[in-house]
């Protein structure tokens, strides 16, 4: 039987990708060309960690929180379920209770609210804090969203961020789900081994199981 092919659910990183207002713009350039070096092109990358598809570490919103290097990489590899929660302003326990989530360890939410990697949204659907204990009771260890944040864009309290990690749930943001169906997949979304970082870009891929 042919093994299912991997499907990319990452935002392509290029000089047109949107960034958080006021954050470091993404830039890639060849800083040392083959003509200059005599053998190779060497690129230079400048970016915010929270550009494109990325994970958050607790240090992002808690000075005493774990950094990327301290996170359990097992969380970012394994079975995941995609569900559709489109056309909602916010998502919490009430909205997820209708879904069968028993045995799910990684949950990806399709909100279908934006989908334009080169435009930063003005408003996004967000997660309410009561989602965290509900997901924890189900045994879910990772939540993924197709928007830049699990909290409202202008929010300073970051209740969802805090409650999710308090309940042992890791955060994956800016995945691209508009070209895949609901259902069960194998997920790989490994962060880089960054020793002191508050997050990391990832190449997130899935394949049906």
Swiss-Prot record:
Zn(2+) 1 binds at residues 50, 54, 56, 173. Its cofactor is Zn(2+). Pathway: Amino-acid degradation; L-tryptophan degradation via kynurenine pathway; L-kynurenine from L-tryptophan: step 2/2. It catalyses: N-formyl-L-kynurenine + H2O = L-kynurenine + formate + H(+). Zn(2+) 2 binds at residues 56, 161, 173. Binds 2 zinc ions per subunit. The keyword Ribonucleoprotein does not apply. InterPro entries: KFase/CYL (IPR007325), KFase_sf (IPR037175), Kynurenine_formamidase_bac (IPR017484). It comes from the Bacteria. Pfam families: Cyclase. Gene3D superfamilies: Putative cyclase (3.50.30.50). Its EC number is 3.5.1.9. Substrate binds at residue 20. Keywords: Hydrolase, Metal-binding, Tryptophan catabolism, Zinc. GO terms for molecular function: arylformamidase activity; formamidase activity; zinc ion binding. GO terms for biological process: anthranilate metabolic process; L-tryptophan catabolic process to kynurenine. The active site is at residue 60. PANTHER family: CYCLASE-LIKE PROTEIN 2, KYNURENINE FORMAMIDASE. HAMAP family: KynB (MF_01969). Catalyzes the hydrolysis of N-formyl-L-kynurenine to L-kynurenine, the second step in the kynurenine pathway of tryptophan degradation. Homodimer. Belongs to the Cyclase 1 superfamily. KynB family. This is Kynurenine formamidase. It comes from Bacillus thuringiensis (strain Al Hakam).
């Amino acid at each position: 039987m042919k093994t299912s092919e991997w499907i990319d659910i990452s935002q392509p990183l290029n000089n047109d990708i949107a960034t958080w207002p006021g954050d470091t713009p993404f830039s890639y350039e060849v800083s040392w060309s083959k003509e200059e070096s005599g053998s190779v092109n060497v690129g230079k990358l400048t970016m915010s960690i929270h550009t494109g598809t990325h994970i958050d570490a607790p240090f992002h919103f808690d000075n005493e929180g774990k950094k990327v290097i301290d996170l359990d990489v097992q969380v970012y590899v394994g079975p995941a379920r995609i569900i559709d929660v489109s056309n909602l302003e916010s998502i919490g326990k009430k909205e997820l209770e209708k879904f069968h989530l028993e045995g799910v360890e990684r949950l990806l939410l399709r909100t279908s609210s934006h989908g334009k990697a080169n435009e930063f949204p003005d408003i996004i659907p967000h997660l309410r804090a009561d989602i965290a204990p509900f997901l924890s009771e189900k045994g879910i260890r990772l939540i993924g969203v197709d928007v830049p944040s699990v909290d409202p864009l202008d929010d300073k309290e970051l209740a969802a961020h805090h409650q999710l990690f308090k309940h042992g749930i890791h955060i994956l943001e800016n995945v691209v789900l508009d070209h895949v169906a609901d259902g069960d997949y194998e997920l790989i979304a490994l962060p880089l081994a960054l020793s002191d970082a508050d997050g990391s870009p990832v190449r997130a891929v899935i394949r049906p199981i």
